[in-house]
Regions:
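Residues immediately C-terminal
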Residues: 55-56, 83-84, 506-507
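Short conserved segment of the HATPase_c
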Residues: 84-107
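Conserved short strand/loop->alpha-helix "switch" segment adjacent to the catalytic nucleotide/phosphoryl-transfer site
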Residues: 28-47
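C-terminal interaction appendages of subunits in large macromolecular complexes
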Residues: 386-405, 420-425, 436, 440-442, ...
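Mature N-terminal segment immediately following signal peptide/propeptide cleavage
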Residues: 15-28
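GHKL-family ATPase ATP-binding module
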Residues: 1-13, 23, 45-47, 55-57, ...
Length: 643
């Protein structure tokens, strides 16, 4: 971290808070400002306030941020930065503190005087959080005094008042989300913990402490990583076997931009690249990732040829160069341009040039100085290249077997009549008997059925050639029609709902996990785009006379049972547990699990790719000890276990 004491005296006052527009319509249209009023929007409130503190850290004025979840799901964020300005803001005649919390797009980022780079736009988040809180109070330690303001749903309830004296600087914000605005106001500790850990990795030397005071015993963790993103790579790779002991670290800057990259290869087959711009995760990549990938491939080919490891005519493709790679890319720039539907892609072309230059120069130097590591990486890439060629041959064999042009559809696929992918859905069903019931019960206009049978491949332990050669997965690849790995093209997807329908038992859960591992590793855009669903079949059928009802859980079974008894507590209710989808007749399967009007589908989403990678590695990978530890820690959360 930069030296903070030298910088505290630098001016950060009201003249650096620019007002762009009034705070309007936030409560009418909260989704425009925080994405949604669901759990993700609720947690976004915390990120907005923490981002303001991190801006202080980025500028070199803050070394410790404390986040506390108090009883009643009250949030408190405290930092030891300079403190939000309290003097009069020239444009409005109001205190800067009031402007920051009551005017949208009031912040110290816009003019360039307050912050060189910024993640949250300082002040934008504060006013939105204020508008969506039942109440909010802010205490600023500055100029030897403690200044306090209080608000309710965006309105001032206590003007700025001096409430004491202080010998330090900083800002503390406490707020309670407004239950009128949110579907739920209960915070998930783990969601906040993961985000805070990520920010601690990205800001080397910054200490972030998170505390949950809601339980009988407070839970607290203080995180500070002097190694920054190098330690982030170590964390991601902790359950994998690294090919070289330490992550390779590179950094460089140009004008008002800088980048840092850490990477390490492991003996697995999957690439994990996590990128950020101004501490904001960019899951769709962008120019910084493009520059990184191009430079990595060029540097490896260049060194391979110079060292004689690559023979004449040999070359390593981009995909091969990234097999088993874990990399974290972090860039900081003054005017980030975010693109894509979710603003999750960096569009600044100058970052491609900067990252490309830094990675090529630093990685080339590293390979020259560490020839043993260089040889290991290039030989792994060559092995990947041979496997990719074998996969290509396997693909060609399938094509030849099924006709000259493209894939014919799998024999077991019962396709639908409609050809518009946006209207169609593919049910991937466990077993032939369930597939038969599903085929008879479906609406053939828009529902296709693909039964799977036998033991499926665990792709966590397999390369692409093994995947293409697997007779259980080939039908899935063919039916979806969008390819695999780097060749996957979401525009060729034949169904926009891919629904896994498996029994509600251990075997069904295993099949779901194997399929999700496959989609995550080889068809990631399926999950990122929200195309994958899990059907929720009922667990029980309850009968009383001619009346039948179904239940999806033990609690629902008990409630329905009581309802069916009505005024006669001794009435006989026959309760049958469904052992499998194949036991249901076609009409039952349609009504309970396939009818869009009555079914329950769970969309598979990916909020934290690093955590998902860790879970798949632990559960499906080679190492036994991490899997055993995971099961011991999480057994209490398990459901649907047959004994």
């Amino acid at each position: 971290m930069p030296d903070i004491t030298d910088k505290i005296t630098q001016e950060y006052d009201a003249s650096q808070i620019q007002v762009l527009e009034g705070l309007e319509a936030v409560r009418k249209r909260p989704g425009m400002y925080i994405g949604s009023t669901s759990s993700s929007g609720l947690h976004h409130l915390v990120y907005e306030i923490v981002d303001n503190s991190i801006d202080e850290a980025l500028a070199g004025y803050c070394s410790h941020i404390e986040l506390t979840i108090e009883p009643g799901d009250i949030i408190c964020v405290s930092d030891n930065g300079r403190g939000i300005p309290v003097d009069i803001q020239p444009q409005t005649g109001k205190s800067a503190l009031e402007v920051v919390f009551t005017v949208l797009h009031a912040g110290g980022k816009f003019g360039g005087g307050g912050y060189k780079v910024s993640g949250g736009l300082h002040g934008v988040g504060a006013s939105v959080v204020n508008a969506l809180s039942e109440w909010l109070e802010v205490n600023v330690h500055k100029n030897g005094k403690i200044y306090q303001m209080k608000f309710s749903r965006g309105d001032i309830t206590q003007p700025m008042t001096v409430v004491g004296e202080t010998d330090h600087t900083g800002t503390t914000v406490r707020f309670k989300p407004d239950p009128v605005m949110f579907e739920d106001t209960v915070y998930d500790y783990e969601t906040l913990h993961v985000r805070m850990r990520e920010q601690a990795f990205l800001n080397a030397g910054l200490r972030i402490t998170i505390t949950d005071q809601r339980g009988e015993e407070p839970v607290s963790e203080s995180m500070c990583y002097e190694g920054g993103i190098r330690e982030f790579v170590d964390f991601i790779n902790k359950n994998k076997t690294a090919l070289h002991p330490e992550a390779i670290y590179m950094a460089g800057e140009r004008s008002d931009s800088m980048c840092e990259i850490a990477l390490q290869y492991n003996d697995g087959y999957n690439e994990v690249i996590v990128s950020f711009a101004n501490n904001i995760h960019t899951p769709e990549g962008g120019m910084h990732e493009t520059g990184f990938k191009a430079a990595l491939t060029r540097a490896l080919n260049n060194y391979g040829k110079k060292s004689g490891i690559l023979k004449e005519g040999d070359s390593i493709s981009g995909e091969d160069s990234r097999e088993g790679l874990t990399a974290v890319i972090s860039v900081k720039l003054t005017n980030p341009q975010f693109e894509g539907q979710t603003k999750a892609k960096l569009g600044n072309s100058e970052m491609r040039t900067l990252v490309d230059s830094v990675v090529f120069d630093r990685l080339s130097q590293f390979l020259e100085e560490n020839p043993a590591v260089g040889r290991m990486i290039i030989e792994k890439a060559l092995t990947a290249s041979r496997a990719r060629e074998a996969a290509r041959r396997a693909r060609e064999n399938i094509r030849r077997k099924n006709g000259l042009e493209g894939f014919n559809m799998p024999d077991k696929l019962r396709d639908c009549n409609d050809r518009d992918p946006s209207l169609t859905e593919l049910y991937i069903v466990e077993g032939d008997s369930a597939g038969g019931s599903a085929t008879q019960g479906r609406d053939s206009r828009f529902q296709a059925i693909l039964p799977l049978w036998g033991k499926m491949l665990n792709v966590e332990k397999a390369r692409a050639d093994k995947v293409y050669g697997n007779d259980k997965l080939t039908p899935v690849i063919t039916a979806l029609g969008a390819g695999l790995g780097d060749e996957f093209d979401i525009n060729k997807l034949r169904y926009h709902k891919v629904i896994i329908m498996a029994d509600a038992d251990v075997d069904g859960s295993h099949i779901r996990t194997l399929l999700l591992t496959f989609f995550f590793r080889f068809m990631r855009p399926l999950i990122d785009g929200g195309y994958v669903y899990s059907a929720i079949p009922p667990l029980y059928k309850l009968n009383r006379g001619k009346t039948s009802r179904i239940a999806f859980s033990d609690e629902e079974r008990d409630r329905i049972s009581a309802e069916m008894r009505g005024d006669n507590p001794n009435a006989k209710i026959d309760i049958n547990r469904f052992k499998g989808l194949g036991e249901m007749d076609p009409h039952e399967l349609w009504e309970t699990t396939m009818n869009p009007e009555t079914r329950t589908l769970k969309q598979i989403t990916l909020e934290d790719a690093v955590h998902a990678d860790e879970v798949f590695t632990v559960l499906m990978g080679e190492k036994v000890e991490p899997r055993k530890a995971f099961i011991e820690q999480n057994a209490k959360y398990a459901v649907n276990i047959d004994i």
